[in-house]
């Protein structure tokens, strides 16, 4: 969990007017985590095991990925493009391979700007569908998607 707490607070301030609530969120983020007998300071990410950590991570990714896709990226591509995200797992599906390759580079830059990076072991471009050249498969959210002609 490497999200930038300063960006997260800016994102929250965009939608939340209650300064007291925002102050509590800031304190939660800075509180640190006990590891054994030592308190580990927290200047990045959200505290592991924190009840609201998944919600905060979702807010962060909403601004970093969802808004970027909806308000910017999608408008500049000539082919069909689809985006599905659950927590920090997501798929981008493109009609044209050259657009997939271009967006892969843009995505790396976008994530880097916000202190994030792609999981290289889970990241790839593959042909999929009835005209696909290979029969590769992929896993997403515990399901395996097979590339078959039927």
Residue spans of the language-model regions?
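Active-site and adjacent loop segments of nucleotide-processing enzymes
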Residues: 139-150
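Conserved polymerase palm-domain catalytic core
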Residues: 1-128, 132, 137-140
């Amino acid at each position: 969990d490497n999200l930038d707490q300063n960006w997260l607070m800016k994102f929250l301030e965009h939608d939340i007017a209650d300064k007291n609530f925002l102050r509590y969120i800031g304190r939660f983020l800075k509180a640190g985590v006990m590891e054994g007998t030592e308190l580990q300071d927290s200047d990045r990410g959200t505290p592991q095991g924190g009840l609201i950590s998944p919600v905060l991570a979702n807010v962060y990714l909403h601004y970093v990925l969802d808004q970027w896709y909806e308000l910017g990226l999608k408008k500049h591509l000539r082919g069909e493009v689809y985006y599905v995200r659950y927590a920090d797992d997501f798929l981008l599906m493109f009609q044209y391979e050259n657009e997939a390759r271009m967006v892969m580079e843009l995505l790396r830059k976008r994530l880097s700007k916000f202190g994030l990076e792609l999981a290289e072991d889970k990241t790839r471009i593959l042909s999929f569908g009835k005209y696909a050249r290979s029969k590769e498969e992929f896993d997403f959210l515990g399901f395996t998607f097979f590339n078959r002609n039927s």
